[in-house]
């Protein structure tokens, strides 16, 4: 048997990407040189106290406000790390509708996605981002000795990813946002609810599972675990414990697991020990809370879940069926009808949402859905869609809109929703449900952030939640525009109010657990309608009864429950606040109180004047024979990337010099690369085989137009590319007289079309997908080197025999002439490079069937955490019709893969083996391959 190892090209950015995951406000990684804004965005800047705030002109008012806030709060944000000042650019991104924020190095910057979400904390959105992301800036400054530009930034970033676990970065930042304000995620029961539920139900999660997640169970994640651990560590070891830990890591940077060792030095325990201590401590505290909080058991109206599954926003239909938005580890989001026997019928899949949301009335479903700009994907939209259950007609009511939380009137004729423009101006609007026309806009003179509105039964009154720095409030507005505040600003997590006759039901956590409450609009008396053990959400009225449907949280997610409307006292607040010690240590109150109101000079930010931003010198390893150093430059707006470097080719004993740039401001992306490189060839002569060497200058220009579209659960991608190059060879040694010294402008063209359906976490591949790819290479300007290559590839993905199985049929064809006769531009059979070919490669037909085997969630000490194990079989044909037929594949066999985290690092490593059996006509032994890939 032959042994072969297959590896990805390794570059130090593997660890750079690792840590970028840690420092996004959601678990979504920032990809360097990633998304762009449209060319027409007009940028300005404010420079104050080390902060360079770069923002679109529409955000002038918010930029002035945040310039005051950021420079005032940073000394308090960094105080427990002994970091008093910083230098960092902050880019305000206002073109998108996905709420997020991050800090990075390489280049050093922070980005705030300024459009506020419809459900988050009980404070101003940009303030919430600032107090969290600035803590990351302080962490970085502590680790880089406070250097404004810590060159080489990507090396520092990679070192941080290797040295420090993600739970610290995010847990410390969440602890900070919680202790410095009246809000913060540490004060939200629903944020920590999955972990509380698991512990109280006797589900003890391993350290790795809690941090890295599961494809089987609901796992809390490193934000939540990190907050709890950081809180316990600060309580035990004091306010400045992390200052000491990070200083020790900075002073002794080259060690194995430096964070664990430094943490043990200053707190007495390493990370895993602190996790076990914290789990036991919070479990005991939550058990006491459960004893003090009377709770009810509610019958479950959906099928018993075997893995993490959410049945969100249940609504009872007139025929007794229940409509929900279902999503699970094995199923992407879709509307589902559930009958009285708990049988499920899938109705319609949907696309990405900022949060799960829909409304139903009179056979009509309405929801909002995120759509990305086809080219400039920093810009996204929130569009309104409807689906008629009777006619099965799908309709998109708005295009290129920024409309959120649509809710139908009882007769299904009107939609109330929230609209937010590029300046963060918020409006409550009413739309015609038939055509999407805005028929009314309500005044919002204070520009409160409005969330989750809904109509009363006759459509004459609307209720909604507002958010500002002081907290959340509950309101009504009538047909005349008169507003009434029913609940004053509070840190309670008020959300999704609906009318119950003359009263209003809503979600809050008055007893320390998220439950459903109601308020009498006349007396303003608040009563409890549910008494859930872990959390109750999303009430809906069952017409003609005195009951409501709602989501009751349990071990595997959001279940469907029902209860009678019986008003009870809200009960005592028994919430367990684990951040109390850190809050007392900081002793700041709300850092956003008493902010100065200064006015700052605003100047244009010229994109062309800021294209070059050299931030790093990194090692690059291409393979076992070639490696070197590379300077990297990325501008702050992700529109221009450049690099220059040198590699040493060990097998040739010579250096190679490279440079390149990518310009991404326009609809096409232009890529220019240059290389001065050594080359070697072997050629036959009458005296035998001889070796020839030369150097060459190689210049390549390419233009790519990537177009991405989406609609419901379907995604479409079109990509057109064209390129050419010029090669000039010199310093020739031992080469024949007819050796070509110049290659003039060969043309490369290609087109790719991709259609995929939305996938679930367990899906190995899309259930349905089609890919067609064409490429053509020619030599129109160089007659002495004539030769063409045309290639086409088609990929068809189908569902397998069981859930999450995948079958792929891939057909490839190429026709090559002239100097390209022996070139290859198509996928080959497994084992191709090890097997002697019968003839030139013209086509391949590749069948692959892949399937999950089990989900062990197995922690092998500190070595590995195995998330899933998958199998696959394959049958591959080459040159069908000449060298093989459908009964005689060239290769066939099976493979086994495991998805895991190694050494407690974040990248998902796919480690696998493949056994390739070769058709007996080739007289070749079986081939064994070891496969190593990674994703982030």
Task: Please give the residue ranges for each predicted region.
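Residues that define the transmembrane beta-barrel architecture of outer-membrane proteins
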Residues: 623-627, 653-657, 693-699, 716, ...
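A flexible loop/linker signature enriched in serine peptidases of the S9 family
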Residues: 186, 307, 326-335, 349-354, ...
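Outer-membrane beta-barrel translocator/channel fold
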Residues: 374, 533, 537, 555-557, ...
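Outer-membrane beta-barrel initiation region
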Residues: 287, 326, 508, 559, ...
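C-terminal outer-membrane beta-barrel translocator/porin domains of Gram-negative envelope proteins
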Residues: 687-689, 737-869, 881, 932
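Acidic/His/Gly-enriched intrinsically disordered linker/tail segments
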Residues: 33, 107, 124-129, 137, ...
């Amino acid at each position: 048997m032959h042994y072969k190892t297959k590896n990805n090209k390794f570059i130090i950015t593997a660890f750079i990407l690792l840590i970028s995951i840690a420092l996004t406000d959601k678990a979504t990684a920032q990809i360097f040189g990633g998304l762009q804004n449209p060319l027409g965005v007009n940028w300005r800047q404010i420079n104050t106290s080390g902060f360079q705030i770069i923002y679109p002109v529409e955000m002038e008012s918010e930029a002035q406000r945040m310039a005051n806030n950021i420079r005032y709060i940073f000394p308090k944000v960094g105080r427990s790390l002994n970091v008093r000042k910083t230098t960092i650019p902050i880019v305000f991104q206002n073109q998108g509708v996905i709420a997020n924020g991050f800090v990075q190095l390489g280049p050093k910057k922070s980005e705030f996605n300024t459009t506020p979400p419809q459900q988050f904390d009980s404070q101003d959105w940009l303030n919430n981002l600032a107090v969290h992301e600035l803590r990351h800036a302080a962490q970085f400054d502590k680790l880089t000795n406070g250097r404004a530009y810590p060159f080489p930034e990507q090396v520092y970033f990679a070192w941080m990813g290797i040295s420090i676990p993600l739970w610290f970065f995010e847990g410390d930042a969440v602890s900070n946002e919680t202790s410095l304000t009246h809000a913060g995620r540490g004060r939200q029961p629903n944020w920590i609810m999955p972990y509380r539920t698991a512990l109280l139900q006797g589900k003890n999660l391993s350290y790795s599972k809690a941090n890295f997640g599961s494809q089987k169970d609901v796992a809390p994640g490193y934000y939540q675990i990190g907050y709890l651990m950081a809180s316990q560590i600060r309580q035990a070891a004091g306010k400045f414990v992390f200052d000491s830990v990070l200083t020790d890591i900075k002073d002794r940077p080259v060690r194995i697991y430096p964070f664990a060792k430094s943490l043990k030095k200053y707190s007495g325990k390493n990370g895993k020990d602190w996790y076990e201590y914290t789990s036991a401590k919070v479990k005991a505290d939550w058990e006491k809370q459960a004893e003090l909080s009377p709770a009810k058991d509610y019958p479950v109206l959906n099928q018993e879940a075997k893995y993490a599954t959410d049945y969100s926003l249940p609504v009872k239909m007139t025929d007794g069926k229940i409509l929900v938005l279902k999503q699970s580890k094995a199923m992407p989001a879709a509307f589902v009808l559930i009958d009285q026997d708990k049988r499920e019928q899938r109705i319609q899949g949907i696309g990405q949402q900022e949060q799960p949301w829909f409304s139903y009335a009179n056979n009509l479903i309405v929801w909002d859905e995120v759509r990305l700009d086809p080219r400039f994907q920093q810009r996204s939209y929130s569009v309104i869609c409807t689906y008629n259950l009777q006619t099965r007609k799908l309709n998109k009511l708005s295009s290129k809109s920024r409309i959120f939380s649509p809710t139908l009137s009882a007769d299904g004729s009107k939609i109330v929703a929230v609209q937010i423009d590029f300046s963060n101006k918020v409006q409550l609007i009413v739309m015609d449900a038939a055509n999407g026309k805005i028929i009314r806009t309500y005044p919002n003179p204070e520009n409160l952030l409005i969330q989750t509105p809904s109509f009363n039964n006759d459509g004459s009154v609307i209720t909604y939640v507002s958010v500002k720095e002081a907290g959340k409030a509950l309101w009504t507005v009538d047909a005349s525009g008169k507003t009434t505040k029913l609940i004053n600003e509070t840190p309670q997590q008020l959300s999704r109010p609906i009318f119950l006759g003359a009263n209003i039901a809503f979600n809050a956590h008055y007893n320390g657990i998220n439950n459903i409450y109601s308020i009498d609009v006349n007396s303003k008396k608040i009563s409890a309608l549910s008494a859930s053990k872990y959390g109750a959400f999303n009430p809906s009225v069952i017409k003609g009864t005195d009951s409501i449907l709602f989501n009751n949280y349990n071990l595997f997610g959001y279940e469907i429950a029902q209860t009678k409307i019986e008003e009870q006292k809200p009960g005592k607040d028994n919430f367990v606040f684990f951040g109390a010690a850190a809050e007392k240590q900081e002793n700041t109150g709300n850092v956003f109180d008493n902010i100065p109101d200064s006015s700052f000079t605003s100047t244009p930010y010229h994109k062309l004047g800021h294209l070059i931003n050299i931030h790093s010198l990194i090692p690059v390893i291409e393979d076992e024979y070639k490696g070197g150093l590379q300077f990297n430059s990325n501008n702050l707006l992700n529109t221009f990337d450049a690099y220059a470097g040198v590699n040493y080719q060990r097998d040739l004993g010579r250096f190679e010099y490279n440079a390149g740039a990518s310009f991404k401001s326009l609809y096409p992306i232009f890529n220019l690369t240059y290389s001065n490189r050594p080359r070697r060839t072997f050629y036959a002569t009458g005296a035998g085989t001889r070796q020839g060497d030369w150097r060459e200058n190689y210049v390549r220009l390419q233009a790519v137009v990537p177009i991405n579209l989406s609609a419901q659960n379907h995604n479409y991608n079109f990509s057109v590319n064209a390129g050419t190059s010029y090669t000039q060879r010199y310093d020739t040694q031992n080469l024949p007289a007819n050796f070509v010294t110049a290659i003039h402008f060969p043309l490369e063209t290609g087109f790719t079309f991709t259609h995929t359906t939305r996938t679930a976490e367990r899906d190995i591949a899309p259930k349905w997908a089609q890919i067609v790819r064409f490429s053509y290479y020619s030599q129109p300007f160089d007659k002495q080197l004539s030769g063409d290559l045309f290639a086409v590839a088609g990929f068809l993905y189908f569902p397998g025999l069981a859930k999450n199985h995948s079958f792929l049929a891939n057909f490839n064809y190429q026709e090559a002439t002239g100097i390209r006769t022996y070139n290859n531009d198509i996928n080959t059979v497994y084992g191709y490079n090890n097997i002697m070919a019968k003839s030139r490669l013209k086509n391949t037909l590749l069948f692959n069937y892949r399937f999950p085997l089990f989900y062990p969630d197995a922690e092998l000490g500190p070595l590995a955490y195995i998330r899933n194990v998958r199998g696959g079989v394959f049958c591959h044909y080459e040159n069908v019709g000449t060298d093989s037929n459908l009964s005689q594949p060239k290769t066939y066999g099976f493979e086994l893969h495991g998805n895991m985290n190694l050494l407690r690092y974040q990248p998902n490593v796919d480690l696998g083996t493949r056994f390739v059996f070769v058709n007996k006509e080739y007289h070749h032994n079986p081939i064994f391959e070891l496969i190593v890939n990674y994703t982030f």
